[in-house]
Amino acid sequence: MATQPLSTSLVRFLTAAVSESIRRASEAGQLGSLTLEQAAGVAPTIQIPSDPRYGDYACPTPLGMAKLCRMAPAQIAQTLQKHLDLPGIATEVAGGGYLNFRLGDSFLAERLQELLRLGEDFGKTAAPHPERILLEYVSANPTGPLHVGHGRWAAVGSTLANLLRWTGHQVEREFYINDAGNQMRLLGQSLEVRVRQLQGEEVALPEDAYHGSYLVDIARRLLDQVKAGIRPLPTTPEEYTDFAYAEMLAWQKQTLQQLRTEFDHWFSERRLHAPDPQTGLSAIQQALQELQERGFLYRAKAPRGEDPKPGAEEAVYFKTQEFGDDKDRVVQKADGSFTYLAADIAYHRDKVRRGYQRLINILGSDHHGYIGRLHAAVGAFSPDVKLEILIGQFVKLFKTDPETGEKTEVRMSKRTGNFVSLNDLIDDPEIGVGVDAARWFLLSSSMDSPINFDLDLAVKQTFDNPVVYVHYSHARCCTLLRRLQEEEKVELTNKVTLTEQQKLPYQEPEERALLLRLLALPDELIAAAEERAPHKIIRYAEAIAADFNKFYDNCRILPLLKEDPLLAQARIQLVQATRQVLFNVLTGILGLSAPESM
């Protein structure tokens, strides 16, 4: 099988060069009191200076080495500079100990050539330590439509999966279906009442039932199928539950697909409660049995460190405190029934047994209390499997009130009866913004920040709307390239244009600034993946659009086709490169469309 061509991470490239210079200087005894062992432990840092006068990249590591070396930072930087092997890159010592790097034309040309050659694969890199990762997100109850918060987890989870894959990891995406417990019984009861109401009976919904109008639609579909002879009318609560469950799950899957969110696995909680054909034990019972054998369970009237309450009965506790939780947790009540935590334990045991090296769960802020107990569940079964829990804040929708002219929060939906659904956000005639805008704005902030979603801005067809601005930038590239091919008969080429002196023929600062921005794609993806920060790619896309439009406005192409064809060709290749990077970011990472005309 052919090896996948990979992109160059400029940060990793420079980091490796500085690390090698530290090793060489240390072996030559030129770094003062720094030992070879200490030299091997130095992890260089590469930054992009805020002022381009200080180079394209900078390394402040000599400043941090001063104490170990017992040398002045500037002296360390000068020593490392002598041992750097970076053809095509100029280095200088500045700022009392910084190593500054300026990429030369030959090096930039090689990287631009790589970008044009790799095309839709540009940005993909190998991970230094690739992992097999299970990423779980959304995981909603199949009792109602998905809400906007679920949409945020869907957008973040699917984008994070793309980021991890592009940066060299094997990722599987999973949706945990909460299809067991009392909520499912209530769903079936609610559907039965709606069916009886449609049949003319005067019967009220119980107070704790599901009141959304979506169940009326499901009841109508059920009666239509009964009338058509497709199925008989349910006669048991379980049959009503099963029909409602199938309808709701299908609806949720359709909504997620509409939002361009796919899953590799749909894991049913019911599997954890079903007895194993061989042992007769459910997955929950097997998990607790293993915890008992490992010494992590005990029976008591109160958790360790607390006095029993009057009349308390014995329950089975899990020693979650040993894994950092604030107190031990009940997994089996005195009556023999299992807690929700018991199912979570069995589920995470199943994840561990499937052989993943890292588990990532994306949860809403109302699940903050689960962090300690889930870490305990994974740690008890395997100290080697890493668990990350990403907690995200919720979303509020705002729209201008036509009567007052003020922004007001949109709380209610005609479709669901009590909240704005994800379907409403996508395609409701009054508040819908479409898939691209929904994904963009749901991805636009750090997960730990609440989102105030401006519905008016999301549908605005001006450059105030960042989705429109980035889409327009891609379409502008495509339109110009089409015109060059169709009207000007220019043949596009992926071979980088250089002068006779093997220099890039650029004349304006906007050209170089745009190229550096485009070449940063691999590092932008690596940083966003490592920091679990998809919103950083939103910022990167906005920066590309801004740099490209500055370039487009200041660096003309069409008049140069005859006046200076070499410069024109070099600028055309920057347009090609911009189109490619925007396409990769929009479609490959963010899950948006990339329009070719607007």
Swiss-Prot record:
Coiled coil: none annotated. A motif ('HIGH' region) lies at residues 140-150. InterPro entries: aa-tRNA-synth_I_CS, Arg-tRNA-ligase, Arg-tRNA-synth_N, Arg-tRNA-synth_N_sf, ArgRS_core, DALR_anticod-bd, Rossmann-like_a/b/a_fold, tRNAsynth_Ia_anticodon-bd. GO terms for molecular function: arginine-tRNA ligase activity; ATP binding. CDD domains: ArgRS_core. Its EC number is 6.1.1.19. It comes from the Bacteria. Its main location: cytoplasm. Keywords: Aminoacyl-tRNA synthetase, ATP-binding, Cytoplasm, Ligase, Nucleotide-binding, Protein biosynthesis. GO terms for biological process: arginyl-tRNA aminoacylation. It is found in: Cytoplasm. GO terms for cellular component: cytoplasm. It is an enzyme of class 6 (ligase). It catalyses: tRNA(Arg) + L-arginine + ATP = L-arginyl-tRNA(Arg) + AMP + diphosphate. PANTHER family: ARGININE--TRNA LIGASE, CYTOPLASMIC, ARGINYL-TRNA SYNTHETASE. Belongs to the class-I aminoacyl-tRNA synthetase family. Monomer. This is Arginine--tRNA ligase. The lineage of its organism: Bacteria, Bacillati, Cyanobacteriota, Cyanophyceae, Synechococcales. The gene is argS.
